[in-house]
């Protein structure tokens, strides 16, 4: 009798669970993408495209929320409890921090997706006032007396770290050795009147507040500025710059807690599709995977001599220790205004 009662109850319980699951599925799912400053416009369009794709594939409604700021600050926010499903930060070093500070992701996170989990690349360029009145052509023009340089704080901004290292390597190659490079960036940052926390803040400082003669910028941000303020700014490509490789990952602890792993993984994989790569190119990032997208957008990216973080600085772990840790080179050269 007890057996029969339990036997009857089990299907009822299963039915309740099934209805509950169906109800939850019908209510949809929400993802949070925690990213760095200049990806706002990219992910607005990409999120719309992926949500449409996900609905067509699964029938489930998807809401994607975005959080943007300096890459280092964004990484710290995740470590401190911001429940990101995916992190699309400015550099692998910031993403590595999610492993070393709390095990939010596995150590080998970069091996989970093609191209070291970097579906797009970028570089660092110079944005000047229209007509280039100060005659800025290369990195060494930024250390001239009287030149005002806008760049964010490498303590909080991933883009600022790319900026700093690009200038350092230029000087190291041109003038010979790290000592000369350190002197060069010391003089460069003496020309920086203010350090914003992120790249978009520096963009606003330069373009809207009209501070500075030159803005050291992500390539995509430079073209967005040119698109919005075309009559006010010009883009200058230096003789040498760095290959910036923003990387992406699911935040394992959060997706497993929230039950969003499947959709989060599909979201990142969609960046590698033809549609994803085309959206990347439309927003002035360099497609890393699709040959079709590379060819389509090749003309908007002038030829440029690029070096990698691994070849020049031994990777992000070493670069962070040598240049951006407490009391490392940036702390030594920067004098607060």
Can you annotate each of these PLM segments?
Residues 38-42, 46, 74, 90-94, ...:
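Stable alpha-helical elements in mature extracytoplasmic
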């Amino acid at each position: 009798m007890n057996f029969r009662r339990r036997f009857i109850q089990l299907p009822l319980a299963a039915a309740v669970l099934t209805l509950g699951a169906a109800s939850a599925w019908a209510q949809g799912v929400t993802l949070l993408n925690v990213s760095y400053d200049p990806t706002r416009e990219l992910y607005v369009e990409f999120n719309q495209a992926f949500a449409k794709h996900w609905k067509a594939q699964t029938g489930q409604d998807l809401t994607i929320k975005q959080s943007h700021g300096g890459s280092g600050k964004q990484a710290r926010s995740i470590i401190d409890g911001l429940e990101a499903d995916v992190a699309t930060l400015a550099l692998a070093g910031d993403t590595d921090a999610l492993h070393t500070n709390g095990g939010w992701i596995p150590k080998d996170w970069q091996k989970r997706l093609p191209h070291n989990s970097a579906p797009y690349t970028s570089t660092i360029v110079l944005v000047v006032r229209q007509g280039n009145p100060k005659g800025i052509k290369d990195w060494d023009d930024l250390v001239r007396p009287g030149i005002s340089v806008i760049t964010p704080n490498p303590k909080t901004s991933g883009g600022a770290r790319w900026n700093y290292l690009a200038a350092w390597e230029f000087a190291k190659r041109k003038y010979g050795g790290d000592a000369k490079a350190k002197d060069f960036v010391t003089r460069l940052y003496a020309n920086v009147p203010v350090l914003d926390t992120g790249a978009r803040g520096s963009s606003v400082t330069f373009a809207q507040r009209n501070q500075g003669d030159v803005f050291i910028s992500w390539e995509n941000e430079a073209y967005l500025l040119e698109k919005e303020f075309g009559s006010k700014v010009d883009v200058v490509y230096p003789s040498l710059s760095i290959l910036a490789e923003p990387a992406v990952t699911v935040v394992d602890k959060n997706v497993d807690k929230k039950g969003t792993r499947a959709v989060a993984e599909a979201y990142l994989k969609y960046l590698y599709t033809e549609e994803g790569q085309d959206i990347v190119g439309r927003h002035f990032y360099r497609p890393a995977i699709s040959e079709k997208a590379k060819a389509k957008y090749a003309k908007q990216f002038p030829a440029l001599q690029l070096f990698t973080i691994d070849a020049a600085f031994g990777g992000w772990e070493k670069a962070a220790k040598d240049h951006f840790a407490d009391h490392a080179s940036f702390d030594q050269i920067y004098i607060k205004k």
